[in-house]
Amino acid sequence: MHTLPDRFEFLSDAWIDEARRVLAKACEQRKAELAPFSLSERFADAPPHLKLPDDVGAWTARYDGEAMTVARGFDPSADVTVEGDYQAGLAGGQFIGMLAPGAMKAMRREVAAMHGRDAVKMKGRIENAAAGEILALLHDHLGRRTVENPDLAHRAARQGLTRHIREMEEQGYTVIERAISPEFADEVRAATLRALLPHQSFSMNWMLYHGREFEQLIQNPMLMTLIDASLGRGAVIASFSSIKKGPGTGVIPMHTDYAHVPEPFPEFSLTGVGVWALEDWTVASGPTWMIPGSHRERRNPRPGENTRGQGVPIEMPKGSVVYFHKAVWHWQGDRTEPGDRVTLHAHFNRGILRSLEPKKTDVQMLHRNSPRLGEMLGEDDWFDKMSAQGRDSGRFAYMNKLHAFTEAKKRELLAN
């Protein structure tokens, strides 16, 4: 697949070549500190367009005390072996910051939450401290450059989301249960309350800029698959907001989020939102209510229109996300139990639309995340990059090809 410069797909030839270059340089520079070490990885069920033998991506890195060799193939005798499913391996490969305390544990925890405990298995240990540091830095270096699997149908099937994409098309919303671990949900909830406290507010925008937890949450691979299916590749963050709701009557009436869109609304989705449950959602907790299929009305609800009886409460366990087409009729339910419901709302627009929040791209934020965050902040498209000579042709061609491939795979998914 076509990618931007310095980007590559997981386990592609370009990925292997970059691993070889980085490891050879690092081992030469730190030769005095190193002892021989080896790492071998094998991931099954890679996307067909990579054209890997039997759709298995495998590679081995071995340092013999003098030189580093990197080659395709799996070596079960390596000091550390990693095996699993390609999509799960990719999810782990896009975690960055592996030298931070607890980072490896957090990565494995979240991959297990998305793909199951046995999706990736690691055996062995690197004893040499310098070698371990080199491999952690390699992981980060590649993670900053590794793009998402562009094959939407393949990706959705391996994430267990094929049904959800069909459901989203039919009823306008879908729920992914436990898309993050309960532990991470607790971390995000605590970070949200810390951000809200100084402002003495029940809601706040610009949550992306209040901690690493929000950077990680908004690019959750499961949610990203629904975004790609609904809005196409290149979708941008419209707004990332938080709401804290205590006991009482729901104050947000039935509405769509297409306030300024002329009726009839387009048949395709212009915008979408993922709402994260940071505690269990039940009827008593005051969840969002939705009318299934109401997006097909292609209009706003009329004053006095008595359709609430068709509504469904969104009940889901902590760590789940409900994603919905913004033309769906929805409202805030009454909270009848004590305590606060804390939610995060990740709003997205098709790439051709503007964000609701001012663009504030932090270079350090881009450096500590996978390319997906840059795509969501508009860094990969050609808008705002016009010169006197015209548009950025490289980015224009990249996004055109990615859009076309994604749409073709979505049609394939819905046809089967």
Residue ranges of model-derived segments:
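Short, structured patches in soluble enzyme cores that scaffold and shape functional sites
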Residues: 43-45, 124-126, 241, 256-258, ...
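Conserved double-stranded beta-helix
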Residues: 298-323, 327-328, 333-416
